[in-house]
Amino acid sequence: MNPLPHRRAIGLMIVAATLWSIAGVVTRQLAPSVQAEGRFEVTFWRSLFAAVFVGGYFLLVRREGWRPLAAAGWPGLVSGLMWAVMFIAFMLALTFTTVANTLLVLSLGPLITALLARAVLKAPIAPRTWTAIAAATAGILWMATQAAPATAAGRPLLGMLIAFSVPVASAINLVTLQKTRARVDLVPAVFLGGVISAALMLPLALPFQAAPRDLLLLAVLGFFQLGLPCMLMVVAARSLSAPEVALLGLLEVVLGPLWAWLGAGEVPAAATLAGGTLVLGALVLNELASLRAGRR
């Protein structure tokens, strides 16, 4: 696939991460009953709307029908399955723990990606990355052990465990993108992920509880927080290295708690701030050092 100019690819990743970061604050605007008891319904509608958005793009804008989906082959299937895991686990995590805790667990993605890239792509891991892994793990352990037994969201430790599956799936997805970016268009995999996620959630989502206002918010999530930014990330990954994608993706972790604080009054706990500072510091320093070393 044809890569974009480097600066344009960076811009796409910044837009994608910013759109991803609105998930928490928009979710908190749903009716309390939907937040508390409709976690499967929320995931279903969000995934379905994302699939509609991406499918509509291929049918109405590119006018290619379903050919790109078939052309994606096994990499598209792997990527689609990983998108489905991320779509499901992220929203379920938000129903059990805070936005800040969820996003900070997601911030382990770059380090998990480095480990997987080492195993699959034979990419070497510098000593600074091992140091960052240790520091980030310490931050996550601090967040987990200091978390209260119950919060406004419900069960924080369970939520953080569910959230951990997101960076794992993201790492598998990113390595798949890296291996195939020159020959396979994996944008259709976002559509496939939405379809798989919606199909798995439908039996658990019934009977529906969402009111028209909730459906409008869920459409915003599906179209602009999920479908569009995931498509942008796939396109940007054709031109950016894995460290660049991971580093720019951390913008979601920085902005997500800010929107939740400003828009939903969800003030991050002291343990989240302390552990998060350690996690983000380790990740950012590691990724910046990696990028500088790559330019030498």
Where do the language-model regions lie?
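Loop-to-transmembrane-helix transition segments
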Residues: 8-16, 64-89, 157-166, 202, ...
